[in-house]
Amino acid sequence: MTRLVDVPAQFDDRSFDQFAGAFSHAVADGGRLLFDAHAAEWASPYGLVGLLAAGQAARAVGGDAPLLTVPTTPEVLSYWVRAGFFLAAKELFEIHGRVPRGKPAADSDVLLPVTAVRAAEDVHEVVGHIQQRATAILSGELGIDPKATMGFAMALSEACQNIVEHAGTGGWVAVQSYHWRRRLARRVVVIAVADAGVGFRASLEPTQGKRFGDRWGD
């Protein structure tokens, strides 16, 4: 039996808990999962890498690859292509719907298309790729001191390094700049990193569990 998981129409950090709850219930019910994104109207980098992490978790359960229906709105579908989502998604999902040909955008508001992070070398490549373009936007458009942009690169590096050190599997990162009219009415840069790995506790337990004994926990 196929279990349906609706992808929120507005898929970002605010709607992710709703999506995660639906995913959890569907997994508990058993059967093949169908992620339905046909009605998607917008997705932040958080939503895109979160959907990939859900597909990764579904594959880890075993059985057939989860299904994914693509957005039907041409503009939304085009953005997902430009953001590099489908290049990663095709390794996890059986995709239903026509995906237009195209490559991730080289110069646009997508500072870093969805990019796989599996090893330390990937982290260095990600930071090197994005640093110059990010600096131009952070200092030129957001008015941040150029020296302070180093903190942006460090935050990106640390977030990606957590995948390498604590996930026990691969993950993804995406970075985008856009005008956030609804909440801030200004231009923002969003970093999103996700994986469906074992997490901090399980990754540290072999060394820290014995050290702290009964005091070891979340």
Model segments located where?
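Conserved beta-strand-loop-beta-strand hairpin that lines the nucleotide-binding pocket
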Residues: T72-R82, L87, V164-D218
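A short mid-domain helix/strand-loop element embedded in enzyme catalytic domains
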Residues: V123-E141, D145-A155, L184-V190, A194-G197, ...
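Helix-loop-beta hinge of the Bergerat
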Residues: A105-G143, Q208-D218
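Conserved ATP-binding N-box helix of the HATPase_c
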Residues: Y46, L52-G55, P146-R182
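Short beta-strand/loop segment at the start of cytosolic alpha/beta domains
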Residues: M1-V5
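Amphipathic alpha-helical interaction surfaces in cytosolic regulatory modules
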Residues: V7-K90
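Phosphate/oxyanion-binding active-site loops and adjacent basic polyanion-contact surfaces
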Residues: F11-Q18, A43-G47, A119-I130, G151-F152
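A contiguous, low-structure linker/loop signature
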Residues: S78-E121
